[in-house]
Amino acid sequence: MGLDTLSNSLKDAMKKLAGKTVIDRAAVDELVRDLQRALLSSDVNVKLVMELSKQIKARSLDEDLPKGINAREHVLRIVYQELVNLVGKEAEFSLKPQKILMAGLQGSGKTTTTGKLCRYFQRKGLKVGAIGADNFRPGAYAQLETLCKKINVPSYGDPKEKDAVKIVKDGLAALKDVDVIIVDTAGRHALEDDLIDEITQVNAYLNPDHRWLVIDAALGQAARDQAKRFHEAIGIDGVIVTKMDGTAKGGGAMSAVAETQSGIVFIGNGETIDDLERFDPNGFISRLLGMGDLKALVEKAEESMNAEDVDVNAMLRGKFTLNDMYKQLEAVQKMGPLKQVLSMLPMGNMNVPSDALEGTADKMKKFRIIMDSMTPQELDEPALINTSRMIRVAKGSGSSVEEVRDLIKYYKMMQKTLKGFRGNRMAMGKMMKQMQKGGMGPMGPM
């Protein structure tokens, strides 16, 4: 579900072109037809698809070939660039004290997204608070309050008060000591006049630094009218597209938003409070095409694993214990679903089956449960774990002895891999520098 179908179709089209011995008009025409089918099935507007097709054809056949690349690479780069243009620019914002007004229809995921935004700014080191100004939907503030309590973020709301402006006024006073204030407003089932009137009044009083619209990806290209109406009312300067993991129309919604010139600021791609991703058009398209997004991967890893938790240099010198492996597994789990993490790696056209990913994630959880039954000495000195200790650990963790053996095998494989890295650190450094070069970095492997 989600963007998987679009991604697989795009990767297949690129793979087919990469296998051509001659890149001529016929090859470009075939590529464009494949791209059209993929984009139209994701509910991208026909007019936009035709414009993109025209651009790819014209540039592929008429542009002079840049030095250092062949015709095949040139066409693939053009496709990449035009797809980036299709999904539009990213909306800019700074990590500083600010007020953010949230807008959107009922059911778009606005309140949940407000909670996710609180978590995002909190993880960036800012004091954040939320105001629940949605008294139209029963239970809206209770939902927001629950989300905020989970992450120890202060919130303000008054379910008995019907005046949204009064709630915002009192909320600003209650949260005067925080850096970032996010205001959740009321939605409706349609773009009704009273909704527009209320949010216009709240906007005038709050005078926010940003006005972000939350849109359900399932709307597809219909998102355009919604974004346009809200923009006319309060001046939307960023859009958050939610539920990207649950619809095939995400591409349509994103391209529709791009038409309004309101850049996308985040995309929601899961149900947990950490499932909110800063939108980067280059990285997003790179992942769709199977070229990974190393920048996003590094950011996720840095957020999930504190530098003091794992001594990477010690690992590369050969000191790698079960304790280290436990911390690694914990960090990977914090980074989000395994499928999402793997999509950030440049894996080309390699599609890992969903059941295989689920099995791997389950095994990682099982390994942590087994290690929870080990003594500190065993975690620091895995060589001590003999058969009798395996039996004890298996009983303590509700596992089989065979599963404990699997864990030890996995540990030894990791240890061996790290020793291999130690011998190739210079080569690794050179490779990472190549990957991190600006411009068209993600296109490197193609």
UniProtKB/Swiss-Prot annotation:
BP terms from Gene Ontology: SRP-dependent cotranslational protein targeting to membrane
Domain of life: Archaea
InterPro entries assigned to the protein according to its UniProt record, in alphabetical order: AAA+_ATPase, P-loop_NTPase, Signal_recog_part_SRP54_M_sf, Signal_recog_particl_SRP54_hlx, Signal_recog_particle_SRP54_M, SRP/SRP_N, SRP54, SRP54_GTPase_dom
Gene Ontology cellular component annotations, sorted alphabetically: signal recognition particle
GO MF annotation: an example: 7S RNA binding
Annotated GTP binding sites: 104-111, 184-188, 242-245
Catalytic reaction annotation: GTP + H2O = GDP + phosphate + H(+)
Compartments where located: Cytoplasm
EC number(s) stated in the UniProt entry for this protein: 3.6.5.4
Family, as annotated: Belongs to the GTP-binding SRP family. SRP54 subfamily.
Free-text note on domains in this protein's UniProt record: Composed of three domains: the N-terminal N domain, which is responsible for interactions with the ribosome, the central G domain, which binds GTP, and the C-terminal M domain, which binds the RNA and the signal sequence of the RNC.
Function of the molecule: Involved in targeting and insertion of nascent membrane proteins into the cytoplasmic membrane. Binds to the hydrophobic signal sequence of the ribosome-nascent chain (RNC) as it emerges from the ribosomes. The SRP-RNC complex is then targeted to the cytoplasmic membrane where it interacts with the SRP receptor FtsY.
Protein name, UniProt field: Signal recognition particle 54 kDa protein
Species of origin: Methanocorpusculum labreanum (strain ATCC 43576 / DSM 4855 / Z)
